[in-house]
Amino acid sequence: VRRPLPGPTDSALRVEIITLAPLTIIAKRRVGACPIRDLGPTFGAVWSWAASNGHTTRVRGIYGLPLDDDHYDAGFDFGPDLAAPDGMHLVRIDRCECAQIRMHGPYENLEPALDFLYGGWLPQSGREPADVPLIHRFYNDPDNTPESDLVTDLLLPLRV
């Protein structure tokens, strides 16, 4: 379900309310400040595990959860029936409504969009964030995609 909401005239910062299907992410936690563009080895560790166990065809999505400035969970949704291996963990997110901004371009553009989402859109929306971390949903791999073609959803889970 998608409903556009009033927002800035810049279509790159249009906020929509979507219903996010349940996610079960096998994630590896990055500890220490790190720009998104440098998280490749963290995502790569999960991908290597998936490849060595024949799970790459099960990938439903690529996700990141910025927990705070020094902790980031990077991983993949393989569906609900896999267990996390040693050194990784499961992140389960129930079905929820989210405020979504779809971003096109370099990851450096995410910070201004987050500032708008939290500082501009959220206060005027009448909504409150749920007790679930912000979610990054990545649509392509920065190792083989030009920066200008990167697509990332910023998903802010909302209280019902």
Where are these regions (language model features)?
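A solvent-exposed interaction/effector surface
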Residues: V1-V160
